[in-house]
From Swiss-Prot:
One of its GO terms (cellular component) is Smc5-Smc6 complex. There is a cross-link at residue 931 (Glycyl lysine isopeptide (Lys-Gly) (interchain with G-Cter in SUMO2)). It is found in: Nucleus; Cytoplasm; Cytoplasm, Cytoskeleton, Microtubule organizing center, Centrosome. Residues 12-77, 119-196 form the BRCT domain. This is SMC5-SMC6 complex localization factor protein 1. Disulfide bonds: none annotated.
Amino acid sequence: MEDGTPKHIIQMTGFKMEEKEALVKLLLKLDCTFIKSEKYKNCTHLIAERLCKSEKFLAACAAGKWILTKDYIIHSAKSGRWLDETTYEWGYKIEKDSRYSPQMQSAPKRWREELKRTGAPGAFHRWKVVLLVRTDKRSDSLIRVLEAGKANVILPKSSPSGITHVIASNARIKAEKEKDNFKAPFYPIQYLGDFLLEKEIQNDEDSQTNSVWTEHSNEETNKDFRKDAGFLEMKGALRETMYRTQKEMQNHEDVNVGSILIQHHKKEKFSGSSKDLKFVKMRNTFGSHTYENQKEIKKKDEDIQRSYTLRRKRKKGKESNCKKGVEHEKIKSTLRRHIYNRDQKEMKNSIFAEYAKESKAMAIKTDVDVVEIKNTLRKHIYRAQAVRYNCIRIDKQPVYNVEVKNAEFPRGVLNLIESLIEGHFFKEAIEELSTLQAHYIPPVCVLHALLENVLQDNIDTFSGRYFHILSALLHLHPPWKSPAMSRYYLELFQCPTCMKGAWSLVEVLIRSCLFNESFCHQISENIGSKVLHLTLLKFFFNLIESEVQHLSQKLYDWSDSQNLKITGKAMLLEIFWSGSETSGLLTKPVNMLLEWTIYSHKEKFKSNDVFKHELAYLLAGILGAAIDYWIFLGLKMGRNVMRHMSDDLGSYVSLSCDDFSSQELEIFICSFSSSWLQMFVAEAVFKKLCLQSSGSVSSEPLSLQKMVYSYLPALGKTGVLGSGKIQVSKKIGQRPCFDSQRTLLMLNGTKQKQVEGLPELLDLNLAKCSSSLKKLKKKSEGELSCSKENCPSVVKKMNFHKTNLKGETALHRACINNQVEKLILLLSLPGIDINVKDNAGWTPLHEACNYGNTVCVQEILQRCPEVDLLTQVDGVTPLHDALSNGHVEIGKLLLQHGGPVLLQQRNAKGELPLDYVVSPQIKEELFAITKIEDTVENFHAQAEKHFHYQQLEFGSFLLSRMLLNFCSIFDLSSEFILASKGLTHLNELLMACKSHKETTSVHTDWLLDLYAGNIKTLQKLPHILKELPENLKVCPGVHTEALMITLEMMCRSVMEFS
């Protein structure tokens, strides 16, 4: 950093934890101060993952700070110094096809430059603001944004004069306006974001002097207008007079008008001070002169006629007249030539105008064709989704969004039901409600009163009938029936006691079922309460699924219309995206739902508990419905959903599923009800597993072309993926550091011992190891024995669920430090989880094997039959850990308990556990423990073959999921090809549209590009299949065979209908 340059003070916003930690790692290489805080501090540079309206983003805008992309840190770290910020600033480049407006994209750059130019301390430096917002985290955040922009925030009670802005919640604005306590305009809370990101910058000094300048400019404009009006009137009169004079010259063949006009024009120069007067005078003079001229013309014509009759008698007169005739002819020819040129020019202009009209009409016609083709393609997608959701019906419903006109619930009946509920006559209350349900919508207060008693376990016997009422309500009066019904369900689906909104109830229900967490308020805690919570989640799933079905049907029914409008906000949109149709996919609720879904499947794979399986199914369904709704809205709005889904969701899910086996991943992917979700998660996993050895993976969104030309050849090479392994020098206690672990290790601090090198295994004294093991075992059985009963004081002091910054529990630390006594005590406690993982994914058994603590390993294996010997991080199992660090005795213990399957496990580099053993003798001893009647070489050869077979099978499954779902979503079926009059005809249409769009617009439509690529790939598919790798054709696996059959069927459709 140059001398005198202030030190960089960095904050970040919008990043996921993994990406943020990786950037922090890079910051350590640079001279800066990093502030890790959710609140805005007085930083110099804000690194933003995307454009947003977060506190830090708005505050940095208001303060005129540098708001930069993450590439600024990445490239600066690579250069070893801070680079110039200009090209990394948000707003440096404006993307035309972005979902953000150009105004919002350029806001950070505009505000920084504006504040620098004017020298103003902040965007709000002349504001005096009163905040009428409830005191909480939200109000504190608003104050920090205002203070960053140098606004003067004033307390409502001490409101002096001169207040410029009153910012309040929408609910309070109307009430406060009626009180009229503040002589200032009111603004909603979202005004701050709109002011900074959406509106043009208006200088406060300019706005103060605006009225003076406006008045002055109006006066000047009026003066100029009067002058211009006089000038235009004079110029028009001149043109008209000249035209009349030229016409008279043509008719009467006069020769003197041109010179008179020139003379007169020279005399009548325009003066700014007396234009009007001179104009009137000149016009009168010009008119009288023209009149005299006409008289003179008539007189001269008579003279000419007389001269021609007397030309034989008067030769001199004849010569004189001939001379005049020659002059007359010259002037006549000049005028005729001028008129001819003018007519030719007018005719040429009319031809150009007609051609321009024809070209415009052709362009409009081509645009219409493009729109028609795009609508046809969208209709195919909508139809495929409608089939998926069983929405195609014979009886269409053309009228939507009609307000529900049900009669008001009878007051007498309402009082009766309320009295029955208060008296705990729940059976009678539910019966009364059921009989009236077909004719009336039950009031929310009644359903809430019943729900409150259901949660308190007061209606145990009749809770089923209550949920039957909710199901009937959803069937008779769905949320999409009208905006009023949507509001009704948003009010209904919340905790009847806390009333914190729908998302709050969803979160509480999931946490109760998934983590056994307490409810948002005190309720009955019995075995059946979790079942009730699961039933409420089922109702929520049915509720949002009905909204997705309705939107799908509506898009299909109205696909021929250009004016499809969706009035009212769906529950899904309000809950997951705060009612914003333009919101990004991964909001906080969606992220939380993703994490819960993945965690629920991890729990499901550990047990056969029906409750856990049903919960995992429900969460996958809710997630799929939410994703589908966001995608359908994006298609309606023309958003490139393929790019957003591939970039955001797929990579996020694949990273979170690192510790899933291939079989678990298959079950996980197939559990999604959403075809889109299946497709993108399968692609993300495929890219990670099958393309990790390839350095260049295309960043283009998923397409048929990408699957056939990139993924299919990559799948054929899975048998040789073991080549080019990275070799890492081994140290005792130092695990091989894989890419996914490096950032965590850097931030958390390396937790392994650093010893010089790995000793040769031949030098190990195995007998000494065995004797020391026996001694330790004897000691652990005698002196170290301890239980919960005889050590109560220790148990009370020990919090075995507590973790340190690395995520290590008491079990991890006992195994790392070889604290056998503490380990035995911990293992005797109820509820202890021996398979618990730290932040990096390591278990206590991993740590004991890694550090060579043999007795700890033995105690775990003896006392915990549920210990997972196959648990892995990037493929590193406990056996990998033990043998890579030379702990052969531990390796023998693990093989005695785990068997030969442990020897078949590979890490991310493709290494087997025995690959770490240098000595053939030790290798044979370890192999003999498994009691396999085979040689180590043959065993490894079979393991290698089995491994590649599994890789090929799993890759085929992933590619099949992508291919089948893609063809289903975009309707690439034989019916589609037939309806398009064959691929050739459709390809010609798409190419024509594409070329037209490229000549008329910088950006082509993503849907046209996608289908054009799909059709081109389908046409070449028969030729491509002939060149498939041989291992794909001969592999006996079910998934590989299914993939080949799918491709062959697509080829038949192409050849048959083209």
